[in-house]
Amino acid sequence: MRTAIVYASVHHGNTEKLVKRIAEECQVDLIDAVKQPDADLSSYDMIGFASGIYFLKFHQSILEFVEKNLPDDKKIFLICTYGGSANYKTIEQILDKRHASVVGKFGCKGYDTFGPFKLVGGIAKDHPNEEDMKNATDFVKGLH
């Protein structure tokens, strides 16, 4: 099954760290939504979207990528890193319009220094850690 993960990793590289580990251990292609905003996904059987959570949603580049590039009727999985909590609502609304089937979701803590967290040196400083990366890799392996 040909699989890609489209990701955005902006502030601390949490999401990129996670998806690069997944790519090392699983047969997936990585697509940076910021650097490759027009990537063609038509040849993939399953597509993952991965992002940190920004203002309770996936990064804007991911949301725009889905709107613009996702072929209808694809199997989708979602991965997020977060300081506060996971939130899939906005991206799931967009995916629903594209008749995509969400086959799984994975989230883990990620180092966060946004807003008031900066005053205390950030939260989730050691995340994603080895356990988070193993869990993410196991999650993707379990989808195949």
What are these regions (language model features)?
Residues T3-V6, V10, E16, R21-D29, ...:
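FMN-binding flavodoxin-like domain, especially the glycine-rich phosphate-binding loop
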Residues Q27-D38:
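A short beta-strand-loop structural module common to alpha/beta enzyme folds
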